[in-house]
Every structure is written in structure tokens, then in C-alpha cells.
Amino acid sequence: MHQKNILTAGVELKESGKALIMIHGRGSTAKNILSISSYLNVDGYTLIAPQATNNTWYPYTFLEPPAHNEPWLSSAIALIGELVSELAKTIDKKNIYILGFSQGACLTLEFVTRNAERYGGCIAFTGGLIGDKIYTDN
């Protein structure tokens, strides 16, 4: 499953008071998603980018039933949850932003749907909720 392999950039969390978790897409890397920060208004943020095992968060398309993407999907959601929990020890969740691109956007949306709280924001570049239908239990 996914290991806690994290790249960081930007300002130290104790100084910034706000963090952006950046989740890459299938076939990409944490380093690559961090590179788009130069196009975003994130001066003064702590940037955190987890790396997916084998550059993919889950094996199949996001339109498959979630069970088809297990156990990888649950592992990815747990990793994002662990990052949010660690950040929340230092900063308020309303200062935690989560951004994803493609497969990372799907994971971002799935995480915030399953863990609904007052985050600073959720940014999804080209993604949707995971599954062949809306799973209201999530």
C-alpha cells in the first residue's frame, strides 16, 4: 500500500500557519505537482505533496465501483487523513487546503466528501467523485 513519502516546499508550518496539500495524478509525482505552485498564489504557505506508490493512487478509473479500487483507495484516503491530522495538531483545519490534479483531484474530492469538515478550501483540477454512482454512505 501507500507509504508516507512526502515532499515539502514553501514556508515552515510554524511560520506559515496555513498549508496546502498537493496530490498528483496517475503517472505523475509529488515533485511534479509541487512545480505548479509557481502558478498559484501560495506565497507564505507550507506545501506538502505525498507520493503515491508506483505513481498511482488506485489501479482503475475513478468511474469504477470503489470496491474495484481497493485496497489502494482506502490506503490513499488514510494517508491524506494522516497528513490532515498531523497538520491539525499545529494549525486549525480551516487553514488546511487540499488540491489535486486528475486522479489526485478525484482523491481530493473523495477525501473531503468522506471527511466533511471546515477546511480552508478544496481545489480539484479535472476530477470527480470516485465510483459508478453517488455513494451516500460516504
Question: What is each stretch, according to the model?
Answer:
Residues 51, 99, 123-126:
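Alpha/beta-hydrolase-fold catalytic nucleophile elbow
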Residues 107-111, 133:
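Hydrolases whose catalytic domains are alpha/beta-hydrolase-1, hotdog thioesterase
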Residues 11-12, 129-138:
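The feature captures the conserved acid-bearing segment of alpha/beta-hydrolase catalytic domains
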Residues 117-130:
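A conserved short beta-strand
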Residues 18-19, 95-97, 121:
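Structural motif
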Residues 35, 110-114:
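Active-site signature of alpha/beta-hydrolase-fold catalytic machinery across serine-
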Residues 99-104, 108:
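Gly/Ala-rich beta-loop-alpha elbow adjacent to hydrolase catalytic centers
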Residues 2-91:
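Serine-hydrolase catalytic machinery in alpha/beta-hydrolase-like enzymes
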